[in-house]
A protein has these predicted regions:
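N-terminal leader/targeting pre-sequences
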Residues: 1-13, 18-123
Length: 123
């Protein structure tokens, strides 16, 4: 289960994904790498050839700039090898994008710039 709490975001829907590298360097969080995709699938929860292991439903941000009760289940294990979130040095990252994810287009669903990032790492 992933729970997201965030504030000071633009109201509306935003793409949110787990990325392959546990780094979130400013200014654009590109150090987080691509979507976490150990199985080599296509992007998008609605894509018949997908999704990436790091694809998640869009995040909804309320008029006050805060995330509206975001919880989602992912099938990717936390530990246990290269196909897990902690399977390689440095962990992974969770990235929020400026626009909504269309859940189909490669490589990132036309979800726009990376606007927030957090590292997922072992305690």
């Amino acid at each position: 289960m992933i729970n997201v709490e965030a504030q000071s975001l633009t109201p509306g829907e935003h793409g949110i994904h787990i990325h392959e590298t546990g780094r979130c360097d400013l200014p654009d969080f590109e150090t987080a790498g691509s979507h976490f995709n150990p199985y080599g699938t296509e992007h998008g929860l609605e894509n018949p050839s997908g999704p990436h292991a790091g694809d998640m439903p869009n995040l909804l941000v309320g008029e006050n700039g805060e995330v509206v009760n975001y919880q989602t289940e992912i099938s990717t294990p936390l530990s246990g090898g290269e196909e897990s979130l902690m399977g390689h040095t440095g962990g992974t990252a969770i990235v929020i994008h400026a626009d909504r994810d269309d859940q189909m287009s490669n490589p990132s669903g036309n979800s726009g710039a990376r606007i927030a990032c957090g590292v997922i790492s072992p305690g």
